[in-house]
Amino acid sequence: MKIALIIALSLIFLSACQPQDGKPTHSDSQQSDKSDSKDEFVPQWAKKVVWYQIFPERFRDGDPTNNPTLESIIGADPQVPPKHWRVHPWGSDWYQLQDYEKANGEPELWKHLLRRRYGGDLQGVIDKLDYLQSLGITAIYFNPVFYSPSLHKYDGASYHHIDPHFGPDPEGDKALIAKENPLDPDSWVWTSADELALKMIQEAHKRNIRVIFDGVFNHMGINSFAFQDVVKNQQKSPYKDWFIIDSFDDPEKGTQFSHTGWFGNKSLPEFREDSNGIVSGPKAYIFNATNRWMNPKNKGVEYGIDGWRLDVAYNVHHNFWKDWRKLVKSINPEAYLTAEIVDKPEKVQPYLMGDEFDGEMNYNFAFTATEFLFNPVAIKPSEFDAKLATLRNLYPSGVAYVNQNLFGSHDSNRIGSHIVNSGIGNFRNWGKYFGLSQAANNPDYQVRKPNEQETRLQKLFVILQMTYVGAPMIYYGDEMGMWGANDPDTRKPMLWPDIHYVDEIYLPNGQKRPESMIDKVEINSGLLAFYKKMIAIRNQHAVLQTGDYETIIIDDDKGVFGFKRFGQNDQQTQIIVIINNSEFEQTVSLPKEQDQSFKDLLNESRMEENGEFIQLTIPAKWASVLLIQP
């Protein structure tokens, strides 16, 4: 459907868009979406932040003396430990096997990639907080930092201790932990890694950066204190009711120990649930660990984390989350709770009604943006507008403003690689696309570096991300121009200017690329500067953080979409964003009131006055971000 906004061969911005038959189109989206804090349950600070996701093992090695050992990774997938192992060189070619890996004789690449450890740690994060501050980041979401043998740490051995190899004294920490009674919080010590985590939180807070941890409360790992006790003591274990045990060792019955793992993965034993959610034993443990990190040593919430991201929240009963939210908000009413729920918006809605979570990792925003900006056959601006309106209007007031508007994460291919492979499948079909976007499962997946045109499309997404309703979230390294297929390739070591990176010569099949296809691995300084610019625009203009929203331009024929961010007082500062998603340059005309000034914050474009209108020309696949002041 086309909305008639064309006057004298140009697009005209109107306060309310009208189609050719004079009837309003997408009335929900045409109404102003307002942020009204007095009726909201969300923490107001969460509207104003720019998020950065850190995958600790791959972010920065700040202390080589604490690096993992072969013994420390036993229990992680793949379960069979290799004969030869070492910490992997940070700047090495991702698909090239090192000599120690070749010596193992393992034919499957994915097993090599999962066994690698690069040595990222909390000291590395502390060392790079100034970088994050200079980028404009004001909140960090950490993938799990708790004790675990894996690189991703979603197989927790403990929730009340930071992984010893993230801290300065791994062996000393392990000795202290071994003396505890996990069921008695009064016996829990503060290890050197725990103390470093508290220091990291304080250093972040000094820079006005909020911190949230990843809570993996649906399951633990096979190395967990509780599960190991069940394996050892079977039916006599005090933890036997924590997990879903299918059978115990019983020679008389001829049964062997067996348990249920998350999605069939035996290395991730699931907690048992009843009608109230996770049963009382693990529930009490989770609650105690929650309090520990939110109000450490009972010194005050200012010393603790500012909230949680909850892994696979959809696998845990609603009643558990309702109880857990009450606990969290009783500790810190301003804590932010965000959930991983990758599903249709109407399936997400029950979790975001005020009694469970404040927001979500907004994958539906990424799906919708993909369909408009990246898909080979893009949806029309009118459909894009309607889908965005659903995401704004489906939830209670304030939720859309605190949803984490991301593109990629540790569970998806990087945005640059997604654009390179934009025709491989439907991103919204999460399960199927997950496999299609893994190089190991799709031999047609292109693992090359994005070219200049593809990077320009990434920038176009960033423009939308930084100006639209919701809190932007950047996956570590996207701002540097990192690329990679889905897990595990999306978890490459971070690019830093003081580390030398060899060229990517090898392909996933072990073959060398033709010389013309070799990719130089380096920081994309132009892309980094663009991220800094767009983040600064968002941080400097409160209207982009908390302002109301209104769609103002929809033209399906010309591929142009525009919206306005403004305060409740129309005389306040306004920002208009116009996206030209077509393959052609477009001229747009905007009405100009007397004494109004227009400034393009993004481009050094020239605007021409034509009576009561301002005209500007927007290049193909680009946008304008206009500041309008009285």
What are these regions (language model features)?
Residues 26, 30-210, 218, 284, ...:
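N-terminal structural segment of carbohydrate-active enzymes
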Residues 6-15:
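Bacterial N-terminal signal peptides
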